[in-house]
């Protein structure tokens, strides 16, 4: 039996084990009152909002948080490409093999009124740290192979101005996008197309100000659309408006404007918009994200490139540690400027998740099915054996069965 056969057998053994875990835990949680789930979800929603300190209580202690996690996954591709690649992807791009997709460790301290300086620092390794942050149309920054191992590296300061102006500088989490680079922070194991082609991290400086409990505005200056790309030496600029319109609804609009090619004339600057609407109630979360980008390309005739994407994830905590997610999405790269291939992609991802928190650890197991369909001049996914050196057949449809296992530690 070859290596691929052993890996596939291992995958199915893991799936069987996952299913046995389902049946065993179903007995444990059968008598659990549903109200506990609602209370847990309500608590999670409440803690995501800024809480007013009690004037009579002593000031909170200064706390550092330490965390680490490992993320292992297997993507079974029914096309079985010989190169083991999920085409045009920067995360979870290896199929038909068991991979360490991410391992990371970090520490952070958030700024507060009694300790105004904050810091975040994290290092990472794994398949998902290999290709993210790079551009399909621009050169890499010097030392990119080492810099990709930094997940966060920033300092922040809460200035005593009005309601509190927070300034952050360094390598910080992107203000664009609904999904994180880390699968543990998302509803699904694999990221949407719009997530892989927008920045997961930003390098630069940002300043945010809460005008009220519901409205926060942020402005930022960053080195480039992708922090590990270096098309030129001119920074990009942007801003975000966040509105907690109601108790259950959040709206965010983020725009970015800057050059992403060697010619930095204003007519060639890229404009990008990311709009997110999220609704939460008890154990149910619904979200809608729409992205659109455009720029003139410095080529004969100065053609205008256009791309857009949208996703509609729905997440439901079913019972106890069990939850399900469905995410339909669409991505259109008219000119191949965004993904590197001119294509229209439609995808559907469904996920079954089990979480097992124990003391300061959390284990997440996900079983996921994903269907992608790519049409167009540059569309398609790899299939089968190599036709000739470096050449593989393409097919418009790809079916994936995915098993992901994430184990994490958090000092909080």
Can you say where each PLM-predicted feature lies in the sequence?
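N-terminal secretory signal peptides that target proteins for export/translocation
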Residues: 1-10
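N-terminal periplasmic/intermembrane-space "pro-region" immediately following the signal or transit peptide
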Residues: 18, 22-87, 95, 404, ...
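Short loop/turn motifs that connect adjacent beta-strands in outer-membrane beta-barrel proteins
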Residues: 51-66, 79, 111-119, 160-165, ...
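Transmembrane beta-barrel domains of outer membrane proteins
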Residues: 57, 106-110, 156-158, 166, ...
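Surface-exposed coil loops of outer-membrane beta-barrel proteins
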Residues: 77-97, 128-242, 252-259
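Outer-membrane beta-barrel pore domains
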Residues: 89-92, 129-132, 138-146, 245, ...
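Glycine- and aromatic-enriched membrane insertion/assembly motifs of diderm outer-membrane
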Residues: 92-128, 307, 312-324
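Solvent-exposed loop/turn segments connecting transmembrane beta-strands
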Residues: 97, 113-114, 127, 197-202, ...
